[in-house]
Regions:
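Catalytic binding pocket for nucleotide-activated donors in carbohydrate/polymer assembly enzymes
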Residues: 72-235
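Phosphate-/polyanion-interacting regions in eukaryotic proteins
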Residues: 1-74
Length: 237
């Protein structure tokens, strides 16, 4: 995403997207609407002057809609807005990672207003903190939170730096984790297959049995990060 100076950004919360997904024919249309946070949010806050929100044409078989849809805005232009909204949909938010690495503040809807419904995020989401990396909002207090953001411009600008630093560190940790995962997987695949002429195939595979995993302690996670950093530095030399 191309950088845009903070003072030159549009003072609105920006979002573009679709609301597609598999249709559950056993659920009434009214109930499907109630469980659609994106439609509900756009109905509630679109046109209030605080948000720049729009659904895009949803034709999965025709990529040329990007040239004909008047609401379409390419990804590299998103930083023209000071705040980027992340709305949960039918699955995880594929664009949240890009928003957190941009030069704009991320406004994150965490309460969709549906009892028992929880947004789905990727592995890096657990460390994100409200008012540190993102501005968390709900269906009810979205307008109030955005007005607060406008009145606390310095806090939001620092939030951008915090989210960028967080994603930079997490990206490094992710690379190290994948590296270690593939190394462990390669060790598990070190076996000698056998073939019997009396049958099509008989494989005798012996691998290590992994123990039941648990959530690592803080000191264990810190040690893993330190070791990852050391390995990456050694690999870069």
């Amino acid at each position: 995403m191309s950088p845009v100076p903070w003072r030159e950004k549009r003072d609105e919360v920006f979002w573009r997207g679709t609301d597609r997904g598999a249709v559950n024919w056993a659920v009434r249309v009214q109930d499907m609407y109630k469980g659609s946070p994106r439609k509900h949010f756009l109905d509630a806050w679109g046109g209030t002057g605080l948000f720049d929100l729009a659904f895009l044409e949803d034709d999965l078989l025709n990529a040329t809609v990007v040239n004909t849809d008047p609401s379409f805005v390419p990804l590299d232009r998103w930083p023209e807005w000071r705040y980027l909204l992340d709305l949960p949909g039918n699955g995880y938010s594929g664009s949240l990672k890009q928003k957190l690495t941009s030069s704009s503040a991320v406004v994150l809807l965490t309460d969709v207003g549906v009892p028992g419904a929880q947004p789905v995020y990727e592995h890096y989401h657990s460390g994100l903190q409200d008012l540190v990396h993102v501005l968390q909002i709900s269906m009810d207090d979205a307008g109030e939170k955005v007005q607060w953001a406008r009145a606390n411009d310095g806090r939001l600008e620092q939030m951008v730096q915090n989210s960028n630093d967080y994603m930079r560190a997490f990206d490094q940790l992710t690379r190290c984790y994948i590296w270690k995962l593939l190394d462990e997987y390669a060790q598990l695949l070190q076996y000698t297959p056998t073939h019997s002429q009396t049958s099509a195939f008989i494989g005798e595979v012996s691998v290590r049995t992994l123990k039941v995993q648990r959530r690592p302690l803080r000191r264990e996670a810190a040690a893993f990060r330190a070791r990852c950093q050391q390995l990456l530095e050694e690999y870069a030399q």
